[in-house]
């Protein structure tokens, strides 16, 4: 999603609050909870939940392994829910031609670097770079090449843009910033 005027372009970044992250966190939570309950049932020797008969699973080694997988899955699920709650990775890219400044803001994990704020002069932008790797694990990334800073990614690698959409976005941004496009 973006907003544009004659001299300002704001590109809003989604971050971790995407439908796929909600689905994975929910599925992982339910699956790991099931594993932990089956492991606990095998330890106690009685059914904690009626779906899985505990007599079929002995505690050593199957019950221990299932309990371990359940606990590990709950930790990973907790991590996913925290990234969703904190909306890690969301933010905006602001390009202001009137002031000649580019501002990039992202939310990070809580702590010292919770707010990631980068500011550059437009005259320091060398180019807009497109990196396209086709194949099984296709990767399409849009970078902004800054003099003395290197390349800064503007579009996340997990966003499923087609090559045409990336090229269109790069062309529009390069035209707005009045810089060349490089393709790798």
Curated annotation (Swiss-Prot):
Signal peptide: none
Key word Transport present: no
Keyword Chloroplast: yes
Membrane spanning stretches: 22-42, 57-77
Topology with respect to the bilayer: Multi-pass membrane protein
Protein location: Plastid, Chloroplast thylakoid membrane
GO biological processes: photosynthesis
Entries under PANTHER family matching the protein: PHOTOSYSTEM I ASSEMBLY PROTEIN YCF4, PTHR33288
Sequence similarity: Belongs to the Ycf4 family.
Protein name as it appears in the record: Photosystem I assembly protein Ycf4
Organism of provenance: Lepidium virginicum
């Amino acid at each position: 999603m973006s907003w544009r005027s004659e001299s300002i372009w704001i590109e809003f970044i989604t971050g971790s609050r995407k439908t796929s992250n909600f689905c994975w966190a929910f599925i992982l939570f339910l699956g790991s909870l099931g594993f932990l309950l089956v492991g606990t049932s095998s330890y106690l020797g009685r059914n904690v939940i009626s779906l899985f008969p505990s007599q079929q699973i002995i505690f050593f080694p199957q019950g221990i392994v299932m309990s371990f997988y359940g606990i590990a899955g709950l930790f990973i699920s907790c991590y996913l829910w925290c990234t969703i709650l904190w909306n890690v990775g969301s933010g905006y890219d602001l390009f202001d031609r009137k002031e000649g400044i580019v501002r990039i803001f992202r939310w990070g994990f809580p702590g010292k670097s919770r707010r990631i704020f980068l500011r550059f002069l437009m005259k320091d932008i060398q180019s807009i770079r497109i990196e396209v790797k086709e194949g099984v694990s296709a990767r399409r990334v849009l970078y902004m090449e800054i003099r003395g800073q290197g390349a800064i990614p503007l579009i996340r690698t997990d966003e499923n843009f087609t090559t045409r959409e990336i090229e269109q976005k790069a062309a529009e941004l390069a035209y707005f910033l009045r810089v060349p496009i490089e393709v790798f």
